[in-house]
Amino acid sequence: KGFYLSDSESQAYDFAVFKSIQLGGTPIVHSFKFDESMLSSGTLNYLCFQKYSREWANFVLANRRNTQKENIHAHDIVYGPIANDKVGVQIRNFMEGNIDFDTFLKKLAFMKSITFQYFFGTQRAIDLLEKI
């Protein structure tokens, strides 16, 4: 329910390949830039997660459980670790009741090579992106 950007070109390419295998077509990676000073200017509602944490997990789980079209938060931009396939397995294990929340957090603590992403959740935020 927004526009996602990775800060890792290799992760973006790997994801494009994955989606092209799933859906057909050719993997394409588009590059964008934006003025990161906007994140601290007070102009945007910005939320930042620097690492996997209880707060990050609660935020991701709440969004995964959301069945409505509208976002459950009012943030223009959210930055934080990507819930990739390995993390997704743990999220699924927790949501299906196979592990408790503390075990879920412990498993996240052992994740290596965290990749981060930006979520642009409002038109105001998306309008700040410039394709390069």
Regions found by a protein language model. Give the residues of each.
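Extended catalytic/binding region for NAD+/ADP-ribose chemistry, centered on the ART fold
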Residues: K1-K19
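Conserved NAD+-utilizing ADP-ribose enzyme module
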Residues: Y13-D14, F18-I132
